[in-house]
């Protein structure tokens, strides 16, 4: 499904629901240029495509505030309306300290998950503090989502930076509709099991109602990981759905084409 078709699909089916997008990177950054504050759009397919969706249907985008003037540009709820020249939706920023940035982002996300999923095993580097701050940062994102989401919200989480957010949200608000798109490869179980927290990550992702991958192969790999990690998981291979007990939550997996 192209992003243009996705936009139409959301407009037609979810116009009465509050859409909350969650990602590490934000779609608009405020920077100090001399005595002025300038708004910039970071490059990237996710930022561009999801920005168009939210401009069309409204909602909230939760992301890490990384700009030098981001704090100056938000209200007391850490929110700012965007785009600046024609506000259509709310950008809610979360704040991370330097240790969290180093360990959650540069550490666990980019020295563990990214190389592991790309099977660059010589670049995988584990540290306990990476995982500790990865969990802390995911909690910060989840808390921000809960401040904005209501019972009719659809929460759309993006990528490997936020693996634990689905479970955190499900535990606090079971009725939320949760979707998660994984923007990098998902390796076979023989590779992913190298990760010391592999089972915890898979279990967290199974709290989504919908889990998207780039290719059918990545769905097969993920399902293999579930099968090997959770003997009680009920897997329907024809529909690519997984029911995980004891919660009996069903996750559907899809590919992006």
Q: Would you name each region that the model predicts?
A:
Residues 1-257:
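Catalytic cores of carbohydrate-active enzymes across secretory and cytosolic contexts
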């Amino acid at each position: 499904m192209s992003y243009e078709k996705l936009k139409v699909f959301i407009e037609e089916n979810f116009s009465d629901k509050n859409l909350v997008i969650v990602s590490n990177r934000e779609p608009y950054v405020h920077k100090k240029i001399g005595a002025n504050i300038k708004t910039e759009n970071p490059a990237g397919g996710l930022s561009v495509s999801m920005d168009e969706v939210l401009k069309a249907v409204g909602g909230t985008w939760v992301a890490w505030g990384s700009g030098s003037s981001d704090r100056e540009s938000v209200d007391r709820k850490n929110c700012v309306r965007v785009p600046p020249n024609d506000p259509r939706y709310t950008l809610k920023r979360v704040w991370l300290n330097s240790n969290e940035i180093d360990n959650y982002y540069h550490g666990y996300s980019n020295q563990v998950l990214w190389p592991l999923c790309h099977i660059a095993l010589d670049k995988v580097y584990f540290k306990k503090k990476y995982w500790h701050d990865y969990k802390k940062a995911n909690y910060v994102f989840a808390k921000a989502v809960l401040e904005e989401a209501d019972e009719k919200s659809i929460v759309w989480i993006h990528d490997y930076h936020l693996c634990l957010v689905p479970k955190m949200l499900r535990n606090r608000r079971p009725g939320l509709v949760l979707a998660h798109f994984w923007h990098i490869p998902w390796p076979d179980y023989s590779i992913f099991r190298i990760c010391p927290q592999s089972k915890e990550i898979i279990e967290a992702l199974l709290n989504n109602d919908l889990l998207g991958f780039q290719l059918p192969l990545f769905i097969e790999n993920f399902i293999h990981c579930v099968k090997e990690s959770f003997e009680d998981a009920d897997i329907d291979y024809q529909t690519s759905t997984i029911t995980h007990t004891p919660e009996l939550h069903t996750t559907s997996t899809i590919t992006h084409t």
